Amino acid sequence: MPTILILNGPNLNLLGLREPHIYGESTLEDVEKMCHELGKQHNISVKTFQSNHEGQLIDCIHEARNKVDLIVINPAGYTHTSIAIRDALLGVSIPFIEVHISNVHAREKWRNHSYFSDKALACIVGLGAFGYEVAIQHAVRNLFPKLTS
């Protein structure tokens, strides 16, 4: 059974509360529940982790080595600043999909740069919490088709 790690960065624990006009009304718990349910439907194990601390995110990535087949990451504010998280992802050689709830390209100019996009299998932006579902569906159809049918 394939395993996907859903990794969420800083302030995503405030989903549903923080700027709902930008990030929507779904909570992190709602997003994680949806990911677990979708995983069950497709015979995929889903693990979730959120932290506001860069080192904890890096430790989680390191611990995923040889245990996880795909990482779906919303690096949040670290998108534009964390070479360390990028290096951790590249160091463990786990493919990853970058997800952003808002359309970062339609926001402040400094949000346009990502340290992850050039190495990601795919980048999903601006679809709200549905972006996580799209990432899992992409994995089902393109990465794990024989393992999930």
Curated annotation (Swiss-Prot):
GO molecular function term, any single one: 3-dehydroquinate dehydratase activity
Domain of life where this protein originates: Eukaryota
Pfam families xref list: DHquinase_II
InterPro entries documented for this protein: DHquinase_II, DHquinase_II_CS, DHquinase_II_sf
List of catalytic residues: Y23, H100
Transmembrane segments: none
PROSITE patterns documented for this protein: DEHYDROQUINASE_II
Chemical reaction(s) catalysed: 3-dehydroquinate = 3-dehydroshikimate + H2O
Gene Ontology BP terms: 3,4-dihydroxybenzoate biosynthetic process; quinate catabolic process
EC number of this enzyme: 4.2.1.10
Xref: Gene3D superfamilies: Dehydroquinase, class II
Pathway as given in its UniProt record: Aromatic compound metabolism; 3,4-dihydroxybenzoate biosynthesis; 3,4-dihydroxybenzoate from 3-dehydroquinate: step 1/2
Site (Transition state stabilizer): R18
Described function: Is involved in the catabolism of quinate. Allows the utilization of quinate as carbon source via the beta-ketoadipate pathway.
Subunit structure: Homododecamer. Adopts a ring-like structure, composed of an arrangement of two hexameric rings stacked on top of one another.
PANTHER family the UniProt entry points to: CATABOLIC 3-DEHYDROQUINASE (PTHR21272:SF3)
Family (UniProt): Belongs to the type-II 3-dehydroquinase family.
Name of protein: Catabolic 3-dehydroquinase
Species this chain originates from: Talaromyces stipitatus (strain ATCC 10500 / CBS 375.48 / QM 6759 / NRRL 1006)
Gene behind the chain: qutE
